[in-house]
Swiss-Prot record:
<feature type="region of interest" description="Readthrough domain (RTD)">
    <location>
        <begin position="191"/>
        <end position="493"/>
    </location>
</feature>
<feature type="compositionally biased region" description="Basic residues">
    <location>
        <begin position="1"/>
        <end position="18"/>
    </location>
</feature>
<comment type="function">
    <text>Minor component of the viral capsid involved in aphid transmission. The RTD domain of the protein is exposed on the surface of the particle and determines the vector specificity and tropism of the virus. The RTD domain is not necessary for virus stability in the host hemolymph.</text>
</comment>
<keyword id="KW-0946">Virion</keyword>
<feature type="compositionally biased region" description="Pro residues">
    <location>
        <begin position="195"/>
        <end position="215"/>
    </location>
</feature>
<dbReference type="InterPro" id="IPR002929">
    <property type="entry name" value="PLrV_ORF5"/>
</dbReference>
<feature type="compositionally biased region" description="Basic residues">
    <location>
        <begin position="32"/>
        <end position="42"/>
    </location>
</feature>
<protein>
    <recommendedName>
        <fullName>Minor capsid protein P3-RTD</fullName>
    </recommendedName>
</protein>
<dbReference type="InterPro" id="IPR029053">
    <property type="entry name" value="Viral_coat"/>
</dbReference>
<feature type="region of interest" description="Disordered">
    <location>
        <begin position="445"/>
        <end position="493"/>
    </location>
</feature>
<comment type="similarity">
    <text>Belongs to the luteoviruses readthrough protein family.</text>
</comment>
<dbReference type="Pfam" id="PF00894">
    <property type="entry name" value="Luteo_coat"/>
</dbReference>
<feature type="compositionally biased region" description="Basic and acidic residues">
    <location>
        <begin position="484"/>
        <end position="493"/>
    </location>
</feature>
<dbReference type="GO" id="GO:0005198">
    <property type="term" value="F:structural molecule activity"/>
</dbReference>
<dbReference type="Pfam" id="PF01690">
    <property type="entry name" value="PLRV_ORF5"/>
</dbReference>
<dbReference type="GO" id="GO:0019028">
    <property type="term" value="C:viral capsid"/>
</dbReference>
<dbReference type="InterPro" id="IPR001517">
    <property type="entry name" value="Luteo_coat"/>
</dbReference>
Amino acid sequence: MPTRSRSKANQRRRRPRRVVVVAPSMAQPRTQSRRPRRRNKRGGGLNGSHTVDFSMVHGPFNGNATGTVKFGPSSDCQCIKGNLAAYQKYRIVWLKVVYQSEAAATDRGCIAYHVDTSTTKKAADVVLLDTWNIRSNGSATFGREILGDQPWYESNKDQFFFLYRGTGGTDVAGHYRISGRIQLMNASLWGDDAPPSPGPDPGPQPPPPPPPSPTPVGARFWGYEGVPESRMISERNDHDIDVKPLSFITMYKWEDESWTSVKLSASYLQNDQVEATPYFLIPSSKGKFSVYIECEGFQAVKSIGGKSDGCWGGLIAYNRKKDGWQARAYTGTVLSNYRSTTTVINGHPDCEVNDCKFKPDRGVESDLICSFHLEAEEDSYWALQAPPIQKSSDYNYVVSYGGYTEKSIEWGSVSISIDEVNQTASASPWRGRARKLAILQETAVPPPFPPGGVMDYHLGDREGDQTGTSEKGLLKKPPLPKWDLQRSRSPLD
């Protein structure tokens, strides 16, 4: 018995102990990853800023239509109006206007346009400076520097107007496709224009240093040179002539010894059966200027096309009793201290040109030397008016043809010098232009153009409406008003 009991005790000592290990439960992976939350980079909501792209269509409109497209709470674009209703401030920073023509190939005229940031001008006052041809598509893009100079605009005030005026007929001209970008913001969030948060009182500040004296800026000195010309039609020199439509002339602009070719808006002050008085516009920036002009008028007529293209074929004489060259105020300009001298040289009675002798008061040359003080409160224009082109056969000294043909007529040589008047400016670095020696007499300032200018609505834009030619000769029409369709009174009357 004792032996058996001892053997069982030894077996228990040799038997190993069992160890129980409890493994932690494994979490099952998600079958789908969580979608990251997207955030609006431009911002949204009623208490933040927002940027919106908008687009609209305006039209169609006729070739002689005038119109105003407003941008702001008065806009016809529902996207602009809807967003302005939810925000307190806004600014339109980019605009593109595309003109889509629907006119026929035979339509004449152009569409003039202008961005009015004052929101006070009328479409009828738009001058023919920036234009699209009625028959061709066109586009214009405007940045923040043109659309307005204020950081933000109240949502109840218009930022600018897009004005347009057509010089065509009553047929459909086309329509506009307009797109742009508007930034919106509430008064509680000012973005980059926010005032700094108040900090601790820094204590008394030292007095600021005196501002440095301004560096003198060189005064501008520039001008225009060239021989303006337009188109006319004539046949035999014992028949009357007529003029073609006129919308611009080409001149050379010089400044700081740099020369460029520019196109300046032009038209007729008066265009009837008797005569046509041409003029062109000279742009002026804001400021005060001294202007000096020399004109040597000679209405040389040149051939167009054929074997004698560009050759001189005669001249159109002046009427000595009519006005000569004149500088006149246009929009936003005032002329003063006007001094001028004019000279008209008659043709000798024994002189013959194309088998025609000169009758009394038939001028061959019309000259002008003048100076005046020009003041402009904003970017604007003034005009230089040429002597009237006489249409009667008594002034026709052009080589005879069997039928009416188109030719070019020169107005004469024109030289314009413009000197900026600036009290703090240094002397202009270039003053080397020669001037004629003449005693200028103080004369009355010529009357300004009527508001909106005088563009040739009746005769200058549609050939079918002007005094023209037929198989039997020159068509005779009753006299037309001297001025525009609004029948404003002529200041020359």
